[in-house]
């Protein structure tokens, strides 16, 4: 495996323009884009940054929702928050930034496709947020987050009801039963776990969801079942 190359000056300038921040410490940006599989001269990768970025993103999105939806209850705010900090949303932001052109990985990771590669793109976005926060402070990080999340926060599908609640009401009405959730698998490191959860409703095919928390994975599984059964309109690909 060859050593990963640092960003060229031209690529760094282009990416900083998309981010809206010129890094005082350029190494922070390089590290935020470096997967653990990549061999670099200094040996750094984005794992620790990802841990911090997840928290910064959650704080800024929670504040955005609190200020934007003044009459929403805790349940609705939680649903919106889970949608906006999900791997799918973070990966969509990564695609908007064309981060796949800049992520440094080993050869084995370059072969990943689908959900696993989506998770890599999502992780890099969180790492990037941490790098911005460390380099420019909370206000700069908040400005970046608002730039790419504010529009998503007010989309119509953000008001969708809690999937688990909706599925429970539907399954009670149709089958007289309560959905059953079980954790099938927990994988990944402690700082970035993945939970695979299956939801079962007696009489129909089960569905599974994979996310960074048990609760979020349950929501994904419930959403998939609601969409499959025609209760909810299926989200367009890429959203």
Swiss-Prot record:
One GO MF term attached to the UniProt entry: double-stranded RNA binding
Positions annotated to bind Mg(2+): 50, 123, 126
Entry cofactors: Mg(2+)
EC number: 3.1.26.3
Domain of life: Bacteria
Catalytic activity: Endonucleolytic cleavage to 5'-phosphomonoester
GO CC, alphabetical: cytoplasm
Domain DRBM: 162-231
PROSITE patterns associated with the record: DS_RBD, RNASE_3_1, RNASE_3_2
Residues the record marks as active site: 54, 126
Key words of the record: Cytoplasm, Endonuclease, Hydrolase, Magnesium, Metal-binding, mRNA processing, Nuclease, RNA-binding, rRNA processing, rRNA-binding, tRNA processing
SMART domains: DSRM, RIBOc
UniProt enzyme class: hydrolase
GO biological process, one term: mRNA processing
Family label: Belongs to the ribonuclease III family.
Name of the molecule in the record: Ribonuclease 3
């Amino acid at each position: 495996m060859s050593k990963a190359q640092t960003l060229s000056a031209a690529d760094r300038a282009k990416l900083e323009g998309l981010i809206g921040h010129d890094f005082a410490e350029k190494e922070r940006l390089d590290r935020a884009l470096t997967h653990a599989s990549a061999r670099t001269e200094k040996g750094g990768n984005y794992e620790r940054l990802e841990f911090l970025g997840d928290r910064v993103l959650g704080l800024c999105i929670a504040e955005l929702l609190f200020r934007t939806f003044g009459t929403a209850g805790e349940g609705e705010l939680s649903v919106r928050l889970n949608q906006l900090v999900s791997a799918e949303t973070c990966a969509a932001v990564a695609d908007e930034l064309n981060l796949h052109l800049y992520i440094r990985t080993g050869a084995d990771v370059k072969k990943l496709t689908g959900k696993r590669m989506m998770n890599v793109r999502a992780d890099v976005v969180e790492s990037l947020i941490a790098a911005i926060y460390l380099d420019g402070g909370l206000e700069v990080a908040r400005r970046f987050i608002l730039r790419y999340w504010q529009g998503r926060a007010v989309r119509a599908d953000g008001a969708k009801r809690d999937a688990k609640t909706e599925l429970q009401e539907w399954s009670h009405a149709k089958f007289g039963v309560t959905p059953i959730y079980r954790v099938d698998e927990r994988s990944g490191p402690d700082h970035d776990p993945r939970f695979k959860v299956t939801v079962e409703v007696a009489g129909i095919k089960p569905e599974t969801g994979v996310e960074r928390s048990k609760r979020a994975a349950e929501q994904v599984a419930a959403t998939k079942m609601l969409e499959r059964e025609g209760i909810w309109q299926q989200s367009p690909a890429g959203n």
